[in-house]
Structures are given as structure tokens and as C-alpha cells.
Amino acid sequence: MTNEAVKQSARRRLACALGTVAMAGTLALAQPNWGTGLGRTVSRDPAPGQGSRDPSPDIKSLHVQGNVWMLVGAASNAVLQVGNDGVLVVDTMTDGLADKMIAEIRKIAGDKPIRYIVNTHVHADHTGGNEKVAAAGQSIIAGNFAGQVGQEAASFASVIAHENVLNRMSAPTGKEASRPLKAWPTDTFFTEDKDLYFNGEGIQLIHIPAAHTDGDVMVYFRKSDVIAAGDLFITTLFPPVDMAAGGNYKGVLTALNRIIDITIPRDKQEGGTYVVPGHGRLTDEADVVDYRDMATVIRDRFQDAIKRGQTLEQVKAAKLVRDYEGRYGANSGPWTTDQFVEAVYRSLTAAAPSSTATTPPKAPAPTQGRGGRK
């Protein structure tokens, strides 16, 4: 066995061990409180590990490759990019783990400032530490942006997210905001992607609409060749779909295929582009392909049942996912098999959104009259 093969094998053993820590924490979190006004599906917590009860206070770290590190906590995974420019953090776990997360960042990065935080979506197990982690950082202020406003802005890391994350955090409908003001994103975008250049490499923030939620972003570190997938991809359970937050199973499949489009495997389909899931162990393209294939087979089975007119109860009784339950199913906890089956069925039977708001009305068809068209 070559030295490189030994390194690959050791990396996979460590990644699997870290994944076991993450999965143990995930299954211990059953009914977190997401606050008010988030709907039935969210109140049952579809995304694994959400909430403030952290059964294990430890955070483990793993150097993935290049500038990128993976942090594994009981609630979720986070990602660091560390270099001469400072630190970029992808997701901040929970408020209860924020102090330990900051301490782990200091172990890895020393006194390098936390410059950016990227939220992959709105859920509290990925954004709960925003306020504390941002306060431990420092923004890059350029030009003539000075005075009190500039000084105050510079004393926090910039929090980047899709605008739908801010919309849901700030409760624009007039209801009480679900998060403190200082936890909200400070830099949002509404386009398909956003680009950064930090620590000597290009970073792509890729938005996948209507997938796990309506504000999902995957982060691709181009030089390091690592993707932080958030909850668009997990290894512990069936794909979580928060329909109350704009999610849809069809979008999850789109996200998985997009990840596969980006990843390039190394020798024997191992290594190459690494993918850090929102929950679970470190993975590569082959792992995502396996997960995508499972999700696609399930979609096809449900579509066939729906075409034959089966109701949700009939689909549940048919147990169309039973051959995958041993690996991804759960009878209790944050995301059960029944919740998954219901989300897939409702996603595939939901009416297509009206296009009248974005598509101009068609011009009336020309009529034939004397002398030609008029």
C-alpha cells in the first residue's frame, strides 16, 4: 500500500469516527423549540439535530484538505477556511455550542480574525451561534467607511446568507422575530450564486431554491476542492425537507445532482473533491452518488404510486422505502421515516406555482382579415 493510500485510509477511519459522534448527538435531539409561527413540520424539527439541547459538549475537528477544516458537534457540522486573510466559518452550530466552537477555531487558527460567516440555511442548529461567533470576529472595512458606524460594523464578522434566510429570521410579517437582531445576516444575496475571493482561493456560494428550505446555499472552496453542503446532503437519515420553510423534495434531488456535477473523484473513486454534509461523516463523490441514487429510486416509486392514484395513507402502508430504512430510517427523533414519506408525497403532489407573476401575458393571436393579418 502506498503512502498516499495509507493517508486516505486513515482519513476515512477518522472521518467515520467523527461521523459516529455527530450521529449520536443527532439522534439524541428529539423535540427542540424553534419558537413560534414556524408551522407543524418545522415544529417537529425535520432537520437533524436542531435545537439548544446539546448532549455532548465536545467539538471535534478534522483537517480536510487545503485551507479547509471540518468541525463536528452534537448539533451539526461546521466548516472553517483558514489562511493569511483570516477565517471564514460556514455555519455556527447552536447557541449552546458557540463558545466551544470559538475555542476550537482559536486552536486551529490562532489569533487570525474571523472575517466571514456563511449560513447554509435558516435552521437553528446551523445558525444558533451566529451572534456569539460574529461578535468574536472582525469585518474587513475598506475605503472611507469610518466613524462610529464603521467602527461598530468592523467589530463583528460579516454574516452572509441568501435573502430568504434573513426574511425568515427577521419575521417580516409583523410577528415577533425568531432570532435576535445581532444573529441576522448582514450581507445577503438573491441571485443564483455569489462569489468571494478569500485566503488565496475563489469561493462559490451556490443557491438551490426550494430544496431543504427556500434559502439553501452550498459553499464550494475551489482551490481546496471542498464543498460544504449544509443540509442539502446528510449521511445519517433520509433527506430532510422542511416544506413549511419553502422546501421541496424535487429541489433536494437538484441539489444532490449539482454537488455531483462539481465533484471530481481521485483514484478508484475515492478522495478528490470532499463534501462536508450538514450532519454525519466526511464524504466524497461516491458517497453523494449513493445517496442521490437512493433518493431518486424513492422518487420514482412515489411517482408511480401517485400516477396510480394512491393516497398518502396507501403509500405509507405500501412501505415504499423499507429497503432503505435500516440505513436511513428512524421511528423517533428529529426526522422520522413517516415524516420523510409525507414530505416526499406532498412534494410530488403539490401544484406547480403560478407563473402569472413573472411571465407576461401572451399577445392575442393574430386574426386573418381582408388584406392580410391585422
Predicted features along the sequence, with ranges:
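Accessory terminal helices/loops
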Residues: 4, 28-49, 140-142, 265-272, ...
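Bacterial N-terminal signal peptides that target proteins for export
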Residues: 4-18
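Zn-dependent metallo-beta-lactamase
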Residues: 20, 26-85
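Conserved beta-strand hairpin/beta-sheet module of binuclear metal-dependent hydrolase folds
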Residues: 60-112, 217-230
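Active-site metal-binding motif and surrounding structural segment of the metallo-beta-lactamase
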Residues: 61, 84-88, 96-149, 155-157
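Metallo-beta-lactamase
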Residues: 63, 86-87, 94-96, 150-208, 213-214, 222-223, ...
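Divalent metal-coordination and catalytic microenvironments
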Residues: 67, 81, 91, 105, ...
